[in-house]
Curated annotation (Swiss-Prot):
Entry EC no(s): 2.7.8.13
Annotated TM spans: 19-39, 71-91, 95-115, 126-146, 166-186, 194-214, 237-257, 261-281, 286-306, 336-356
InterPro entries reported in the protein's UniProt record: Glycosyl_transferase_4, PNAcMuramoyl-5peptid_Trfase, PNAcMuramoyl-5peptid_Trfase_CS
Gene from which the chain derives: mraY
GO function term, MF aspect, one: phospho-N-acetylmuramoyl-pentapeptide-transferase activity
GO biological process: cell division; cell wall organization; peptidoglycan biosynthetic process; regulation of cell shape
Stored NCBIfam families: mraY (TIGR00445)
Protein's UniProt name: Phospho-N-acetylmuramoyl-pentapeptide-transferase
Family per similarity comment: Belongs to the glycosyltransferase 4 family. MraY subfamily.
Domain of life: Bacteria
Protein's job: Catalyzes the initial step of the lipid cycle reactions in the biosynthesis of the cell wall peptidoglycan: transfers peptidoglycan precursor phospho-MurNAc-pentapeptide from UDP-MurNAc-pentapeptide onto the lipid carrier undecaprenyl phosphate, yielding undecaprenyl-pyrophosphoryl-MurNAc-pentapeptide, known as lipid I.
Gene Ontology CC terms: plasma membrane
Native source species: Pseudoalteromonas atlantica (strain T6c / ATCC BAA-1087)
Alphabetical UniProt keywords: Cell cycle, Cell division, Cell inner membrane, Cell membrane, Cell shape, Cell wall biogenesis/degradation, Magnesium, Membrane, Metal-binding, Peptidoglycan synthesis, Transferase, Transmembrane, Transmembrane helix
Amino acid sequence: MLLADWLQQFEPSFRVFSYLTLRAILSTLTALLIAVLIGPRMIRWLQTMQIGQTVRDDGPQSHLAKSGTPTMGGLLILAAIVVSVLLWADLTNRYVWVTLSVVVGYGIIGFIDDYRKVVRKDPKGLIARWKYFWQSVIAIGVALYLYASQQDPAETALLVPFFKDVMPQMGMFFVVMTYFVIVGTSNAVNLTDGLDGLAIVPTVLVAGAFAIFAYTTGNINFSAYLNIPYLPLTSELVIVCTAIVGAGLGFLWFNTYPAMVFMGDVGSLALGGTLGIIAVLVRQEIVLVIMGGVFVVETLSVILQVGSFKLRGQRIFRMAPIHHHYELKGWPEPRVIVRFWIISIILVLVGLATLKLR
């Protein structure tokens, strides 16, 4: 709480800034304002530097008009998140630093990939095996740290939604699950980021829901009432989640159809990895699969498409990920986007219902 602590030096009444709910609101507004105010300048700079999106010529013909649209706008999202968290979160909380390490680490991987593609004009970007290698290094490192530093068995137990008191201990399997959740979610959001605003809105919705999970899990009264494990460190993740919401909404201002900027891998890989680590920390990995159902379906469509083509020589979809399939069926891009948003809203509500339905 850099800003809150600084303000209290001048006026004791500024202790009000130590309240979690107020800091959550301020975190949202700070990230939102950073994104909205810096966005136009960043877009102009990206245009000046000719950092534009390249478009596949075998995809929907309507996408050819997107060629040259500024990309790597994810830098704006990440900057807004990091600044907001540093200002309003309790920096003595190790969960905050674990989450920021994933934000920055996966952001760097995405940045290198984008830089190679759009600046050095290398269509392959960061070679896939190296991308997965560094994603794995970060994910396994974080998983091992969490396993070694656990202070409560509940921190590494599997919380099963809809069932009361079902929390099997995972042991070292916690490390394996954490790895797959972080890396899998990172790549799932990356695959979803193919239409204007398609990935950022589900990300904002899931982050907003996780803010509620983090708050209830980190509050001894709410956790007891809802019969979920009490993990006090998760309360500060509310600030991280609300920063994602604010930064995401600010970015959506420029990314909504027709997009003025794309987030690029620097944004999608980092946001996906961040949702993954937050799910792990609040012990809601299974609920992430529910709330992030759009990400799951997009990923499964790619896996099924590739598997079917290799095994049978036939494609299941006209094009994968599945949002392109609907475009090639004749759906206008805005229809695809909004319907996927609606599905995300429904799935997030189902996920939130697991808090009470046990």
